[in-house]
Structures are given as C-alpha cells and as structure tokens.
C-alpha cells in the first residue's frame, strides 16, 4: 500500500477524552473515530488489525472443529422471554419495536437464537456433538461506555455454541476450545492467563476467562507464584489460616467509642490493628413465603474486603446481594451501621474463615457509640456458620497448595462456559438418544472480544512513540521510508523495487511515498507501530546498503541492498 493512495489520518495531539493508552493511540494512529458514545468507525489501519485478529480466531475455531454460521443482529423478544432472560438481563439489553409494534432486541449475545435454530435442525444423537460459531457485531447498552473500544456499546465478537448428548462430550469440547483460545492468543503475541471465573448472567456450571495482563485492566486476577493456578478474584478461594485458633484470654468488655465509625477509626481509637477487629455487614435473606426478608450478619476481619459474588452464592442469601438499609439495620441490630457486631445478634451469622480464627477481638456492641473488646467465638457467640466470604490478598497461600498468590490487573478478552441445560431445557432443545429416549442437550458457549483484543494488544505493546505491534496482527509488517525520493531518482527506483519484491512475497508493506519531511514519516511509522522498517537514502546507496530498523527493540543496522528483502522474509516466516 502506498501512503499517497491510503487514508493515513494521524494526530499529533492526544484527544482530551481518551483515558487509557490504547484509546489515545488508536485515535492518534488513525485507527478509529468516535461516532457516538461507545460507538466507533474503524478506519483502514484499524480495520486491517481487526481483520488479522479475526482471521486468527477463525483459523483456530476451524482447527477445533467448529463450523461458521451467521445469525441476525436483531432478535425477536419472544426467544428472550422463552429463556427467561427478557426480565433478567437488565437495561444493557437494547429493546426496540418494529412498525407492527412487535418487540425485538439488538443482540448482546446469541444463546437464545442458536438454541432455537438447533432445536429444529438437530433431532438425533447421531448429529452430535455440534459446535457452531460466528464473528459478528454485538450491542450492549453500557451505562458508562469508556476506554474506547475496550468497553464500547457496539463491538465485534466471536461467539460459539456447542451441543452435546451428555456432560462428558461437553467437557471434551470445552477443553478443546480452551486449547484453541490459548493457541489464538499465543499467535497474537499476547501475555495472557486463563483463569477460573464466575458464570455471571450467562449461567452454567463451569467457566474460564482469558485475561490479557495490563495495568489498565478492569479485572483483578490472582495466580500462584509457583504453579499454573489462576482465578478471577471473584472466584479465588481464601483458605482458612493454618493452625488452631488461639485460646481466649481476655474478658468481654464494653467500651465507649463516640464518633467512631470506620475500621480505621476503631483501630486508632482503641490502639489495635485492623487485623484484631471483626467487622459486621448486614445483608438481606431470600424472601419467605410471605415475602418477608430476614437480615443476615456477615463477619470479616477488619482488613479484609467482602467478596460479593461469594456472598450472594451462600444458601439463603438474596441474589442479587442486597445490603440492609439504615432502617433495617436499626431493627435487626438496634444501632447504627458503625456499631454492629456478632455478640448478641439474634439473626443468622456467617463468619469468614479468617475472622473465625480470631481470639480476643474487637467488634461492634450493637449499641450506637460502643464496641466490645475481648470478644471470642463459642464463648461469646455460640451459634454461627463459617464460610469463605472475602477477597484474597497478595501473599495468601494458593488454593492449589503450591506457592503464594500474586495479584495482577487483566483485560478479559475471552470467556468460555459450560452452560449445561440452562437454555436447552428452558427452550425444549432435545434429541433422541441411542435408546430412542428424548434427552435435553448439554450446551457450551465460548466468546472472544475481537475488537477488544485490538485495544488489549496495544495496552501491552506501546512506548512513548506509539504502538509496537506483534508481527501477526500489525496493520503493515514492513514500512519503506525513502529519504527525499522526490528529489532522488535512484532512491525512488530502489524503493519501488523493494516494494514490488516484498508484495510478491506476500508481505504487508506500507510504502511512504508522500512529499513529507523524513521526521514526519518516521513519526507516523512509529506511531502506527509497523514492526520493521527499511530506510533508503542516497548516502547508503553509495555504499550499497540501506538501514533496517526494528520497532520493538529500536535496533538499527546497515544491511546490503541485495540481502534486505531476504532478511525480512526470514524474520516474517515467508
């Protein structure tokens, strides 16, 4: 591609509304332009990257035995009503009506559509397993679109859905797709980790996320420093402290703590560490047959944070997790929120494993402006349950039994689920088994955020000058930068020759034939992130050489004119 015939719309200044580096560089490099909140037009350079990522994903899906299909973006509401997600999905589901006042949705995902299709096309176990995928635009009406294409409302996604006669077949395909995801992200040159994850609104029994490690990531992942264990912090298990709980030695004493509300306030006022304090949070229970909701006390160590995903999965706890309001706190504990404690609390008490290991601890006295010191389990609180309630912290022992946990930020670029029969049962998708009996199909679903991958790759691959693309997903693999070619016929001729040879070898090459100053040309090529560059000048041609420049390492070297094309072909595997 010649720049004189290309839309190369680079910007010198960083747009003020771009928060993360990927958004800044995608705008500056002329990859995208904002159309509306969370919606972007892809310009040629951005689309070239998007297509390369899409092709890698397609190849790995085909290698895994998946078959490509295409489904409508607009979906009839009755399918979502049939699955039960019409009411459950929330305001992110964009709903619309046609001229006949029939309700539809803009598809955020396609479980309902694919299940409806397959239930009419597949009727025998002989047609299973079946794995179908598409690469298509999705729409989710995010409350706060941000970070460019990282969290947009419209985005490109690969979504696959598998159908099986039994759980064993589902697990086999799930593992094959897990391997395909790893292969795809490795080919893209990404530093990523597969992690155990919550199934969220999609549902199902088992789930893994694929996280690209980056400081700008919205997710926090925990992984062992010595094994391959990794989990989203929502799912990472916090083990109980080792050893026996210390014996009680202090008497239970009520002390006045006026105007003390937070854990830090209590610790400072009583001269104790937050680790010696038990904090109590009140949440609502599931409604009984009369619609009434009791209040449940969740107790954690003062320095730990409640893991809301773990909490809402506890038997009897309302889902979604709902914290008691001031009026409910007053009715249940008889005090303000800052003075709640487990001693004397009349309702159900669930204690985190670490908090259950405390002895002689400080807690609220269930009387506004007072706390208790010297509190102890069993002696002062007879009835309670113990569960894993907290977020893990760095340095916790790994749940796998090997090493300690490290915490890193990640960008979720893929998510796979073992759905089981959640959708197939609701939508009556069944087949006849070998014995002629009708059985509900087991399902899996597998998503990759194709457009998000562009931003994630930039978050990992950039410097002060711009993007540094891995070869496999770069918009162009080689840039030809001829110095003053419009004043030097031999520079122009040599550039033309390299361009023709590289194109013939199947290399994506950008020939900068603009009438621009060399500094502008170099800056644009670095901003765009072209991995390899040939710089041609009269002085070098006098000596039979050109300059090769590697974008990632910054390495520069003189290479013979007769050898540069072969060297580049070797680097690119051509």
Curated annotation (Swiss-Prot):
It comes from the Bacteria. It is an enzyme of class 6 (ligase). The keyword Cell membrane does not apply. It catalyses: tRNA(Pro) + L-proline + ATP = L-prolyl-tRNA(Pro) + AMP + diphosphate. The keyword Disulfide bond does not apply. PROSITE patterns: AA_TRNA_LIGASE_II (PS50862). InterPro entries: aa-tRNA-synt_IIb, aa-tRNA-synth_II, aa-tRNA-synth_II/BPL/LPL, Anticodon-bd, Anticodon-bd_dom_sf, Pro-tRNA-ligase_IIa, Pro-tRNA-synth_IIa_bac-type, Pro-tRNA-Synthase_IIa_type1. Keywords: Aminoacyl-tRNA synthetase, ATP-binding, Cytoplasm, Ligase, Nucleotide-binding, Protein biosynthesis. Consists of three domains: the N-terminal catalytic domain, the editing domain and the C-terminal anticodon-binding domain. Catalyzes the attachment of proline to tRNA(Pro) in a two-step reaction: proline is first activated by ATP to form Pro-AMP and then transferred to the acceptor end of tRNA(Pro). As ProRS can inadvertently accommodate and process non-cognate amino acids such as alanine and cysteine, to avoid such errors it has two additional distinct editing activities against alanine. One activity is designated as 'pretransfer' editing and involves the tRNA(Pro)-independent hydrolysis of activated Ala-AMP. Belongs to the class-II aminoacyl-tRNA synthetase family. ProS type 1 subfamily. GO terms for cellular component: cytosol. This is Proline--tRNA ligase. Disulfide bonds: none annotated.
